[in-house]
Amino acid sequence: MTKWSPNSWRAKPIQQVPAYPDQAALAETEARLATFPPLVFAGEARKLKKQLASVAAGDAFLLQGGDCAESFAEHGADNIRDFFRVFLQMSVVLTFAGSQPVVKIGRIAGQFAKPRSSDNEVKDGVTLPSYRGDIINGTAFDTASRTPDPARQEMAYRQSAATLNLLRAFAQGGYANLENVHQWMLGFVADSPQGERYEALANRITETMDFMSAVGITSETNYALRETDFYTSHEALLLGYEEALTRVDSTSGDWYATSGHMIWIGDRTRQPDHAHIEYCRGIKNPLGLKCGPSLTADGLLELIDLLNPENEPGRLTLIARFGADKVGEHLPRLIRAVKKEGRNVVWSCDPMHGNTITAAGYKTRPFDRILREVQSFFEVHRAEGTHPGGIHIEMTGNNVTECTGGARAITAEELQDRYHTHCDPRLNADQAIELAFLVSELLKKNSGASEKKVVNG
């Protein structure tokens, strides 16, 4: 295999690359980015890899979620806070039900670029480049907005830095206090039309919290109850940006992507001899690989060999995204191939991307299909004797109407009320927490540990 360097991907074929008209400006932007401070640090990525190794071993569960694509317009403290608040509630529910730690990774502070099925979009006879995310171009359908602009990469970097700064403060500064999260969760249960279904679990958490307080285990006496580990992730799509933020770790001499703790490769860019695999194989961060219906068992093993040749636990997360009706057809063959070859991986379920439909003129995802894909994921793993390691969802902390269904039974006609996404439909705050409660039932059934309680929000 050829020697790897941060720019060796440039000699490979590449998919999903924007056509920048001003290549000199692009090179200047990338050169400036290469002088900027790293957004994350190698030690943090190593810590995440160690926690993901616990997931691979069946001793923890992965919760990964966030925006389909972050936007410059919606960047604000309230949006970040609301997302983090919902994410923490989901984590506590999953932790308690599964009697396992939950590894928390956001699709945030870098999730700006999106792959598209077509390079161009046509409206009223006018053809313009497709919107590829705010890091590349704008949503407005005019030439100026849709022309890829390198300056947007620096805007994305600065927004990521500001977002990370706030997330670190939330995670370590007391906002993640388990007592706070517990009270938020009780509010959700009280307000939910399905609250009675979730009340038993909520009451058990309350009893456990009361017991811990009675014996002196509180957020004041135990830092683990007021702080939490939270990591960032995004799809590594815009490789010039990723290369500029690829740095050598001074303690190990290894290369790390410092744009996020974990990065993943999309279903459209996983060709083994192409640029995205080439870039990702050389960095030491934890990696994700989206696995869709077209991926063969042999193709998956080839990619695992390229991305995790040392079979390192926690290095590679396989993110299955088939669609609710196709899990039983595709997932077992991949699990069997990986299991037969003894490969160490985390199996995660993306129940979003295979379940997109159009209703009332809007792209949407029915909640029942999302849940059904997760249920099928758990059923297949139970049958194969493997660990259903996590879920990977697109969500927001806001009260949007983008996915139909859920406890509040959002209809296709109601999608227009608060349809705010810049890209694909997201679960709203209530739907995301509801999904966590429903997944918690699957975890409890999977673990069989009804009495053992672990609280590690």
PLM regions: where:
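Non-transmembrane, aqueous-exposed alpha-helical and coiled segments at domain scale
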Residues: 297-309, 315-347, 353-402, 454-456
